[in-house]
Amino acid sequence: MTVKKLENSSDVNVVTEEVKILTNLLNESTEQLIGKELFTKIQNLIKISADKNYQELEDQIASLDNREMIVVARYFATLPLLINISEDVELASKVNVLNNTNQDYLGKLNDTIDIVAQKKNAKEILEKVNVVPVLTAHPTQVQRKTVLELTDKIHKLLRNYREVKNGIITRVEWTEELRACIEILMQTDIIRSHKLKVSNEITNVLTYYPKSLIPAITKFTARYKELAKKHGLDIPDATPITMGMWIGGDRDGNPYVTADTLKLSATLQGQVIFEYYIKQINQLYRSISLSTSYMKPSTEVMHLSELSNDDSPFRTNEPYRRAFYYIESRLVRSEQKLLNITNQHSFLKERDLEHLDQIPAYEDAQEFKADLEVIKRSLEENRDQAVVKSYFTEILEAIDVFGFHLATIDMRQDSSVNEACVAELLKSAEICDHYSELSEKEKVSLLLNELNNDPRNLHTNNKPKSELLQKELKIYKTARDLKDRLGEDLIKQHIISHTESVSDMLEQAIMLKEYDLLDNQSARVQVVPLFETVEDLNNARDIIKEYLNLDIVKKWLVSQHNYQEVMLGYSDSNKDGGYLASCWNLYKAQKDLTAIGEELGIKITYMHGRGGTVGRGGGPSYEAITAQPFNSINDRIRMTEQGEIIQNKYGNKDAAYYNLEMLVSATVDRIASKQIVSEEYIADFRSSMDKIVTESNEIYKKLVFENPNFLDYFLQATPIKEISNLNIGSRPASRKKLSDFSSLRAIPWVFSWSQSRVMFPGWYGVGSAFKHFIDADKKNLQELQHMYQGWPFFHALLSNADMVLSKSNMEIAKQYAELCQDEKTKSVFDIIYQEWKLTKQIILQIEGHDDLLSDAPNLKNSLASRMPYFNILNYIQLEMIKRDREDEIKGVFQSIIPITINGVASGLRNSG
C-alpha cells in the first residue's frame, strides 16, 4: 500500500487557481495605489527574474529611488505570504477530504492506532503517550500580530473557495472581501516600529490558543480515545498532547524576563483558559433547555440548580440551565480568586456580581469537572447520548489537558548565573568564601551536604545581596507562589543552559531549595540539564550517570514517577560543530543516555530544542521523530516550536489538528515499531558515521574557527547587523558584542545565513566528508546508499540537507559576498561555493536522484512558483544594505530592509 506524504503537500491545481486570483487582486490593488508607471516597473522585474537575468535585475533595482523601493519591497513581500496561505488552506482541505473518504496518508491517526492495537502492550502505549509542543518567542517571527490577523481573514475566505466555485457563495462578494483584505494589508505597517516587550510576546503567543490550539487539541484528544475504544482499549485518562511555554520563564540571556513576567505569563494563561471555560458553559446554558415537563434530572443536578442564583421565572422548569448558571458563577469566582484579578462577565446579573465573593471558588479544575460530570451522568440516565457527545466531550477533554493553568511554563537560566548566585549564598551564610575556586569534586561534595543536611534557606540572613541574586530569588519565590495557587502542573521543570558538570545541576537544586521547590526527600520542580555544544553532548553520558546515581536524586525521581528529562540543543551544537557533527552527536547522546536510564530503571525523556531550520534541528515533523534512535522515546517527548513555525503549524485549527496528529502518530510509531534493521547492521553504520563526522567537523572548524577572514565575512556578507536591529523579539541577538562569535546566538546566526541564501548551517562540510569516505574505498558509496535506504536517521539527515540546498541560491549568495570590504574576506565565498557544489553532487549520488527534492515534488513546485518573486526581495535587500552602509538610511525608508527580511522569511517558510 502506498501511503501519501502530505507535509509540504497541497493540491497544485487549486493552489494555482487561488494564487492567480490573489496575484490579480494584489496587482489591481497595487496599481490603484501606486499608479501605472511604477506598477509597470514591478511587472518588468518579475519578467527579468523569471528569465534569470540577474545582472539586469540588479541594475533595474539599483535605478529605483527609496520611495519606489519601499512600494516594490512591500509588493514582493506580500506575494509569498499570500501563496503560503493558499498552500496551507489546501493542505488542510486535502486532509479533511482524505479523512472523510477513509483514505490513507502518512501519519493518519486511524492507521497508527490500528497498527498499535495489535501489540500486547497497546493500552499502555496509548495511555501514556504525551507529546508536548513548547511555544517560544525566539526572534524569527518577523510578522506583526496585526498582519497575522489579516492573514487569518484571508485564510478563512480561501477556505470557502470551493463553495465559490460551486456557486454556493457569491463570487463577486467573496472577491470583494478578499480585495479589501489585500488593500488593507498593502497599506499596513508590516514591521513593528518598536521592539517587542516580553509581555507582548506572551500575549502574541496566547492568541493561538482560543483560535486554534484549544479546539484542535480537544478534538484530537477525543478522537484519539474514540479510535482506541473501537479496539476495546479504554483510556479515559490519556493526554496525548499537552502544551508547554517558555515565554515569561526563560531568562537565559534575556534581562527582561523577571518574576513579574513569570507571574504575568501564568496570569494571562489562566485568563485564556478561564475565558474558554466560561464561554463554553455559557453556550451550554443557552443550548441545553431541557424541561422537567419532559424529563427527570438526577438529585445531584437538582442540588446544583438549587445553589444557583438564577431565579428567573423562565428557568423554573429548567434545572440544567440553573445548574450551568451556578457553575459559571463559580468559574468567574475561581478566576478572580486564583488569578488575583477582577473580570466583569456580561452573562452574570448585576446583583450576582455584587455578591460574587459569597460563591465558592473551585479549588482546582477537577472539582469543576466533577460538577460537569454530574450533569453528564444525569443526561446519560435520560438517554440523551447525542447531547452528551455534542456538548460535553471536548470541554471535558479540555479540563484534563489544560486544567486552570493552560500550559506548563518552563523556567530556564544559564549555569554561570546559577553558579554566581550559589557562590554568593554560600559566602553570605558563611559556608564557603571561595566556592567558584573549588574543584568539581569539592563543589559536588559541598552542595550535596547542603542539600542533604542543611534545612535552612540560605538567603534568609540579613546580609546585603547583589542585584542579580535578588532578582533570581524573587523569581523562585514567585514560582512557588504560583504553583501553590494554580497547581503543580504550572511549573514542572527548570532547565540549565550550558550544563557542563554535575555541580551545574546541583547548583540549580540549591536555588530551588531556597523557596522549598525541593528538599532532601522530594522535588516539586525537576532539574533539567541542557546539553548544547558537541563537547557537552559527548560528556552528557558521564554527567547524567553520576547525577542519577546520587541518593538524593533517586529520592527526587521517586516523587517524579522515575522520569528524568534531558534537553538537547540543536542550535548551538550545529554552530559549534556543523550539521553532521550536531546531528550525529545528538543521536549518539540519546542512545547513550537511554541506555543509562534502562540500566538504572529510570525513564530518560527528551526535550528537543529544535528551531525552524534544518540547521537548528527543523525539518518535517513526522520524519524528525521517527528518525530518533529506537527506544529513545519511552512515552513522553517535548520539543520547542519557535518563531514563524508557530504560525505555520498552529495558525488555524485545521493546520493545528494536522500537525498535532503528525507529532502524536510519529511518536506512537517510534514507540511501537520494531527495529527496522538489526543492531549489528546499525553498528556498522555507526562506525562509518564516526569517521564521516570526524572529517566533517574538521572541515567545518577549518573554515569557521581557523580561517581569519570567516567572521568578517559573516558580519559583512549577511544581514546580521540589520537583523540585530529588527524589532522582532525581546531577547538581544548576542550575549555580548556582535563581533564575539562565541556569544552570538544561534538563532540570528542561522537566520542571517537564510537571508543571504547560503543556508550554511544546514549543509556545510557534508560534501567533503562524504567524498573523503567514498574515495577511501569504492564499496563505501554503496554502503552510504544502503544507509539512506534502510536507516531512518540517515535518510532524514540527507533529506533535510537536500531541502536546504534547494532553498539556497549561490548566484544571490555571490552578490552578498560583494558586500565584503576586501578581497581576502570575499574569498571565503569561493570556499563555501566549492563545498556547496560538492555537497549537492554527493547527496544526489547517494540518494540516486537527478535533482534536488525528487522525493518532494509538491515542495519543489511550491518553491519554483515563488522563487522569481522572493529572489527579487534579495536583490532589493542587497541594494538597500549597500545604500545604508554607505550613507545611513533615515526615516520611513529604514523599514525597507526589514520588509525584505520579512518577505524572504515568508518565502523560505523555515528560516530561523
Curated annotation (Swiss-Prot):
The active site is at H138, K575. The keyword ATP-binding does not apply. Its cofactor is Mg(2+). Its EC number is 4.1.1.31. GO terms for cellular component: cytosol. GO terms for molecular function: magnesium ion binding; phosphoenolpyruvate carboxylase activity. It catalyses: oxaloacetate + phosphate = phosphoenolpyruvate + hydrogencarbonate. Belongs to the PEPCase type 1 family. NCBIfam families: PRK00009.1. This is Phosphoenolpyruvate carboxylase. It comes from Lactobacillus helveticus (strain DPC 4571). The gene is ppc.
